[in-house]
Amino acid sequence: MPGGLYRTIVGADALAYGLVAGANLVGLKLVLGSYPITPASSLLHVLAGMKEFGVTTFQAEDEISAVCCAIGASYAGSLGVTSSSGPGIALKTEAIGLAVSTELPLVILNSQRSGPSTGMPTKTEQSDLYQAVYGRNADSPVPVLAASSPADAFDTAIEAVRIATKYMTPVFLLTDSYIINAAEPWLIPDVSSLPQDKVEFCTAADADGFHPFLRDEETLARVWALPGTPGLEHRIGGLEKDYDSGNISYDPENHHRMTMVRKAKIDGIANDIPKQAVTLGSEEDAVAVVGWGSTYG
């Protein structure tokens, strides 16, 4: 192991520290909207004890309220986060589609367990990958990340926050019952070495020609304007928007254009992440076996 100061860390703690660090690195307050479910409840418990780091936690009456709370927090200028396991994610899918449509940053944590339905709540399983990638109506692309170990959850959480805010998109972060409950040595990082990418909100100086779906030429992310900013009054929602004005549109050609730009935005994230390296064997070998999450090795 590399030299440095280590401590034993549980996956839930690493996730919480990573989310708090990620929010701090982009200059946002963290708001968690969650509803208890095994094995994801431990993250809610840990973050609820982090008020001194500017964390707000809201235990909602159900999964739908929890994710909608997180979306509302992001609309208001915070980092919205929601957490659950497979059955709860199933209930959140319509609201996650709303976050795709409104193009708001949202980090969605799924601590996977055995299914289907109630399944085996206390047993681990990596069975929600397709749910994360495809589990919404229509064309609703989102990036999906997976932690490979309890310690790796810290770095993966920071990366999820970075991508969500840079590209104005919901991001799935997959763990499982093993990762969130297991413990391992964690190399405490040098905070000064962590990547800082502060969010820049639109200001009153940007009012001329403003609409909420103006886009960055490189990332295709839309602009982020806080409600109540003078001259930046706007509306966003689940109805399709006109590409050139942000107004509601039922035009089929415009819908195709918006569908393709949302897809291109997510596809472009591939240019912003490191290329994957061979863990065992050689790049010259004939067969590649791809692992991910807690079985990546």
Tell where the protein language model's regions lie, with residue ranges:
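Flexible, low-complexity linker and terminal segments
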Residues: 1-18, 22-26, 156, 161-297
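Short, well-ordered, mixed-charge alpha-helical segments that flank or form enzyme active sites
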Residues: 115-117, 152-153, 180-183
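Active-site/ligand-binding-proximal alpha/beta "capping" segment
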Residues: 139-162
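Thiamine diphosphate
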Residues: 1-135, 140-142, 146-147
